[in-house]
């Protein structure tokens, strides 16, 4: 395993660990999730550049689009929760309420 892939895997693992540690705060969870998506983007972009196939060149762009959608939905949820409760705790969410 090359040092670049090892560093990217380490960044993904640290972001995943941060997601597990800071799971009670929505903002910290969103930042860790964004770190995971960016490390996946870099890894897929490096693999696509080594594959020399036209079909693999579109994969990083698709992942980046999904990451942008995830960020937009997460920030909208964060703003909604902050305006309603004044806090960013995830335990304030109750999906059974209308």
Curated annotation (Swiss-Prot):
Any one GO CC term of the record: respiratory chain complex I
Keywords, sorted A to Z: Electron transport, Membrane, Mitochondrion, Mitochondrion inner membrane, NAD, Respiratory chain, Translocase, Transmembrane, Transmembrane helix, Transport, Ubiquinone
Described function: Core subunit of the mitochondrial membrane respiratory chain NADH dehydrogenase (Complex I) which catalyzes electron transfer from NADH through the respiratory chain, using ubiquinone as an electron acceptor. Part of the enzyme membrane arm which is embedded in the lipid bilayer and involved in proton translocation.
Location within or outside the cell: Mitochondrion inner membrane
PANTHER family: NADH-UBIQUINONE OXIDOREDUCTASE CHAIN 4L, NADH-UBIQUINONE OXIDOREDUCTASE SUBUNIT ND4L
Subunit comment: Core subunit of respiratory chain NADH dehydrogenase (Complex I) which is composed of 45 different subunits.
Keyword field contains Kinase: no
Signal peptide location: none
Transmembrane annotation, as ranges: 1-21, 26-46, 61-81
The EC number(s) this enzyme carries: 7.1.1.2
GO biological process assignments: ATP synthesis coupled electron transport
Lineage of source species: Eukaryota, Metazoa, Chordata, Craniata, Vertebrata
InterPro entries: NADH_UbQ_OxRdtase_chain4L/K, NUOK/Mnh_C1-like
This protein's name: NADH-ubiquinone oxidoreductase chain 4L
GO molecular function: NADH dehydrogenase (ubiquinone) activity
Keyword DNA damage applies: no
Membrane topology: Multi-pass membrane protein
Catalytic activity: a ubiquinone + NADH + 5 H(+)(in) = a ubiquinol + NAD(+) + 4 H(+)(out)
Family: Belongs to the complex I subunit 4L family.
């Amino acid at each position: 395993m090359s040092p670049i892939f090892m560093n990217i895997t380490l960044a993904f693992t640290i972001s995943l660990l941060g997601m597990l540690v800071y799971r009670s705060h929505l903002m910290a969870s969103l930042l860790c999730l964004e770190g995971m998506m960016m490390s996946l983007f870099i890894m897929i972009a490096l693999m696509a550049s080594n594959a020399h196939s036209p079909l693999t060149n579109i994969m990083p762009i698709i992942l980046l689009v999904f990451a942008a959608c995830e960020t937009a939905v997460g920030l909208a949820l964060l703003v909604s929760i902050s305006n309603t409760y004044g806090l960013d705790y995830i335990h304030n969410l109750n999906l059974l309420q209308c």
